[in-house]
């Protein structure tokens, strides 16, 4: 993403990825303040894509919503602009077979919160073709995701 933004703008971008494999929104909430505080003043934008792992053993909608509220308000309190990605729809995976519809439920939460907390959404719709195992992206999928994030970031100008 940093390379793509630099190429498009002739400016220097550094992108940090603080994602942890298997992490839920509750896990991220526990460590988010420290991450955000350590980047206060240097990071201007915070991209957030969280919730796919919440579908494995579905996190209740009220808890997912509360986790997002706290994370997004922490982003804003640390002077950063939040952009939240919608969750890509999952295709077949044994681990998620019974809970794939939860991504749609979580996306409704994201869309509702965007109006109340005043943040932009980056749509990750129609990404199914890029899933290698029904859940995780191929290299091309991550490149497509970077293109979508970059368009949303550059639209802030």
Regions found by a protein language model. Give the residues of each.
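Alpha-helical cap/lid subdomain in secreted, periplasmic
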Residues: 4-7, 27-157
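A short beta-strand-loop structural module common to alpha/beta enzyme folds
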Residues: 8-24
């Amino acid at each position: 993403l940093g390379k793509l933004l630099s190429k498009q703008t002739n400016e220097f971008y550094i992108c940090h990825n603080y994602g942890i494999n298997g992490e839920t929104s509750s896990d991220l909430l526990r460590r988010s303040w420290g991450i955000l505080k350590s980047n206060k003043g240097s990071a201007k934008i915070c991209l957030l894509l969280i919730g796919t792992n919440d579908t494995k053993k579905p996190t209740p909608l009220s808890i997912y919503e509360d986790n997002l509220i706290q994370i997004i308000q922490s982003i804003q309190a640390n002077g950063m602009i939040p952009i939240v990605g919608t969750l890509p729809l999952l295709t077949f995976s044994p681990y998620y077979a019974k809970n794939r519809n939860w991504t749609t439920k979580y996306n409704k939460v994201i869309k509702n919160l965007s109006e109340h907390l005043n943040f932009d959404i980056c749509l990750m719709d129609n990404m199914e073709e890029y899933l290698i195992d029904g859940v995780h992206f191929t290299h091309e999928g991550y490149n497509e995701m970077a293109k979508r994030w970059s368009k949303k970031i550059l639209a802030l100008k």
